[in-house]
Amino acid sequence: MIWICAYRDWALDIYDDVLENFDNVNLIKSQEEFTNTIDSFTASDSILFIGWSWIIPTVIVEKFNCICMHPSPLPKYRGGSPLQNQIINGERLSAVTFFRMTGKLDAGNILWQKAFPLSGNLKDINFQIKTLCFSGIFDILNNNYKEHKQDEAQSSYFKRRTPEMSEISIDDIKLYTAEDLHDKIRCLQDPYPNAFIVCSDGKKLYLKLADYEK
């Protein structure tokens, strides 16, 4: 049995692709559904987490074959908001990484990893992720991968971004380049908390799309 744990639109597209190509595929879309389904898992099942936001109890990941997709070149950029943190930090290359889940966040053995450029808007980036995700799932379910440990010496961890961190202040405009600010705006497009500036009346002006002079 294959279980796909996903709820974001782009992740549901991946579920559809898997459903078309494999038998016995099931979808779990919420934490409540996951909790209610645990008793149905068996040791031979593959449980894949794609764009999943909820913490899975250690007892579950140690008992079952739980595999997670993380959009970063693990062991770098473990933790929350990986795409946003990479783009805001000026990274130009990321990766789709599938790893075996353990009790430690994003630290399990890597099963599959492929690089992709962090260019374009979030729609462009998510399209690349979707394409690579299906390739990774196809390889993993067909046992076409080489498992290896993560290099802890190369690891980095970032916290999930909060809506308040999306602000672009006057100081930011003076300090950062047009490309820097463009990166912040493009990585915070819907459905994420958009970049914004606070105007003289105290209201927020949201910046959903931007371009800059090359």
Predicted regions and their residues:
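One-carbon transfer enzymes
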Residues: 1-214
